[in-house]
Amino acid sequence: MKCSLRVWFLSMAFLLVFIMSLLFTYSHHSMATLPYLDSGTLGGTHRVKLVPGYTGQQRLVKEGLSGKSCTCSRCMGDAGTSEWFDSHFDSNISPVWTRDNMNLTPDVQRWWMMLQPQFKSHNTNEVLEKLFQIVPGENPYRFRDPQQCRRCAVVGNSGNLRGSGYGQEVDSHNFIMRMNQAPTVGFEKDVGSRTTHHFMYPESAKNLPANVSFVLVPFKALDLMWIASALSTGQIRFTYAPVKSFLRVDKEKVQIYNPAFFKYIHDRWTEHHGRYPSTGMLVLFFALHVCDEVNVYGFGADSRGNWHHYWENNRYAGEFRKTGVHDADFEAHIIDILAKASKIEVYRGN
């Protein structure tokens, strides 16, 4: 009797081990074949599949995108198309200065404060705290939807836009980024009529329509104090030059260019050629970090080799290139490499 009972227990034990082995094999096979899951609980209606990632992680990839980061024909977020680009590009650094990245590292702080040194020093964080009570301190580009194609036009101010006929094409983009003076009235056929982002300094600032984001490019703490003043009390009227005491822009659409991002371009992309990157480069790399597809208009000389603005008739207006502040030739070289890497499309104009 005792022997029979012992045999029965051993048989049951072997059976249990066999069943557990089958379950483990089935489970392992199921994961290896990457089953599809309903992503309704993830806020969408698309089916997704589990993709092996790092230990303890599972990444969700939407079916049908073949791993692409957007639905454009070319996507900025797709790695592997250019080793040079991938080694320079850092998606973790935000082009917008916000409450979350308010604290600058000492090396960035020193570099930024030397761009336009001031006699009186200011506590940058205290200035930002006050500013973010007036304008948003959030990053509007935090989330990227791989099911969208955000097309962006970066419109420079080159005279090569005159007679180009690019206007309608420029206006077809989701984001249209312009800089400094950049008039559109009277030039719509060549430069377009729409603007979504306008990048300016205090010394170049102008009033904007309510549907346009004013992106302030600050060179000093006084620039931050100026925008807070220009949207409230109007006390600041002078930086190193006269500035508008009041500015008519949509407060909810004001964004502040991140000095850390500014230095990142200087260090990694323009590689310290010139004292600091030009406004055109600042806007171009802003677009490269918030857009899926980037098309560039109005950069470089015209077909006769003249460097002037499209609203000017003075072909000698490009004398700024000789100041040494920016290295226009090296920046043009970087733009050419980006185009060859299929990261941007450059429209050369007239």
Curated annotation (Swiss-Prot):
PTM entry text: The soluble form derives from the membrane form by proteolytic processing. N-glycosylated; necessary for proper exit from endoplasmic reticulum and trafficking to the Golgi apparatus.
Spans within the Cytoplasmic topological domain: 1-6
Q: Which pairs of positions does the record mark as disulfide bonds?
A: 70-75, 72-149, 152-291
- Recorded metabolic or biological pathway in which this protein acts: Protein modification; protein glycosylation; Glycolipid biosynthesis
Which reaction is recorded as catalysed by this protein?
a beta-D-galactosyl-(1->3)-N-acetyl-alpha-D-galactosaminyl derivative + CMP-N-acetyl-beta-neuraminate = an N-acetyl-alpha-neuraminyl-(2->3)-beta-D-galactosyl-(1->3)-N-acetyl-alpha-D-galactosaminyl derivative + CMP + H(+); a ganglioside GM1 (d18:1(4E)) + CMP-N-acetyl-beta-neuraminate = a ganglioside GD1a (d18:1(4E)) + CMP + H(+); ganglioside GM1 (d18:1(4E)/18:0) + CMP-N-acetyl-beta-neuraminate = ganglioside GD1a (18:1(4E)/18:0) + CMP + H(+); a ganglioside GA1 + CMP-N-acetyl-beta-neuraminate = a ganglioside GM1b + CMP + H(+)
Q: Name one GO cellular component term.
A: membrane
Annotated GO biological process: ganglioside biosynthetic process via lactosylceramide; globoside biosynthetic process via lactosylceramide; glycolipid biosynthetic process; glycoprotein biosynthetic process; lipid glycosylation; oligosaccharide biosynthetic process; protein glycosylation; sialylation
Positions annotated to bind substrate = 116, 157, 180, 240, 276, 280, 300, 309, 326
Principal subcellular localisation of the protein: Golgi
Q: What's its EC?
A: 2.4.3.4, 2.4.3.2
TM ranges are 7-27
Look at the named UniProt entry and state the broad enzyme category this protein falls under.
transferase
Identify the Pfam families for this entry. Glyco_transf_29
Q: Could you tell me where this protein is found in the cell?
A: Golgi apparatus, Golgi stack membrane; Secreted
- Which keywords accompany this UniProt record? Disulfide bond, Glycoprotein, Glycosyltransferase, Golgi apparatus, Lipid metabolism, Membrane, Secreted, Signal-anchor, Transferase, Transmembrane, Transmembrane helix
Which molecular function GO terms apply here? beta-D-galactosyl-(1->3)-N-acetyl-beta-D-galactosaminide alpha-2,3- sialyltransferase; beta-galactoside (CMP) alpha-2,3-sialyltransferase activity; protein homodimerization activity; sialyltransferase activity
In this UniProt entry, which residues form the Lumenal topological domain(s)? 28-350
Q: Which residues are glycosylated?
A: 211
What membrane topology does the UniProt entry give?
A: Single-pass type II membrane protein
Q: Which family is annotated?
A: Belongs to the glycosyltransferase 29 family.
Q: What does this protein do?
A: A beta-galactoside alpha2-3 sialyltransferase primarily involved in terminal sialylation of ganglio and globo series glycolipids. Catalyzes the transfer of sialic acid (N-acetyl-neuraminic acid; Neu5Ac) from the nucleotide sugar donor CMP-Neu5Ac onto acceptor Galbeta-(1->3)-GalNAc-terminated glycoconjugates through an alpha2-3 linkage. Sialylates GM1/GM1a, GA1/asialo-GM1 gangliosides to form GD1a and GM1b, respectively.
What's the protein here called? CMP-N-acetylneuraminate-beta-galactosamide-alpha-2,3-sialyltransferase 2
Q: Which organism is it from?
A: Rattus norvegicus (Rat)
Gene for this chain: St3gal2
